[in-house]
Amino acid sequence: MSVFTHLSLSPINIAAALCSAKAYNSAYAKGEQMINETMYARGAESSIIREIFSYGLERKAQIGAENVFDFSLGNPSVPAPAAVAESIKKALELPSDQLHGYTPAPGLPQCRAAVAESLNRRFGTSYEGKDVFMTVGAAASLTCTLNAVTNPGDEVIVIAPYFPEYRVWIEKAGCTCVEALADEDTFQLSVDNVLKAITDKTAAVIIDSPNNPTGAVYTCDTLTRLANVLREANAQRDSENPIMLISDEPYREIVY
């Protein structure tokens, strides 16, 4: 077994990488543990969502894809919009350094400005490009956000049932995942349960609407009451340590 890492190709870095690989291989041969046990355990656990997805692939091979309705991972079953396909084709014509090169860490300035303009036009906000930080997927965004607004030992509230990866990202930031049960009849966010879950260690509350996995769309009244509760809680706290509201919105555009 070998370990490879992404390093600039200087003699010092190459030597360091080779030494690290040799040390790892030596320890591996001796049966020594060289990896994070907590993360290994999480990776070794079976994911029911992935199991269902794999089962769906098997059934498609057996009886035909048109006879299987797979609701596991949420893969699209329709073609991409024409505008998306055309944009991808156009991107392939960019100069090589733009197509394959690195972007600034927060993302391309023109892309950030376009996102800010879209949000302002649709939601009446007043963002600027500098307020937008681009990531590859929501997982990276939530990981960065949690690392930015929490400290080890803090607590982060999630609305149960919730997307399982929230717990992984929260605990990886050194925080405790605290569950606030949704309304059992409507799956609406229960403001009362969120209020009960708030402690001196609460650093953030994560919500997503439409919700994964329930599909519930939080009402304006529910969100307004949640905002008021958090404002009241923050009024009693140190102004430098407010409870942050993190809104995960991968399904914002999918409301039926």
Regions found by a protein language model. Give the residues of each.
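Walker B catalytic acidic pair
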Residues: 249
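Conserved core of the PLP fold type I
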Residues: 96-240, 252-254
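N-terminal small-domain helix-loop-helix segment of the aminotransferase-like
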Residues: 35, 39-137, 144
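Short hydrophobic transmembrane-like helices used for membrane targeting/insertion
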Residues: 1-3, 12-14
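Residue-level marker for buried hydrophobic side chains located in beta-strands
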Residues: 245-246
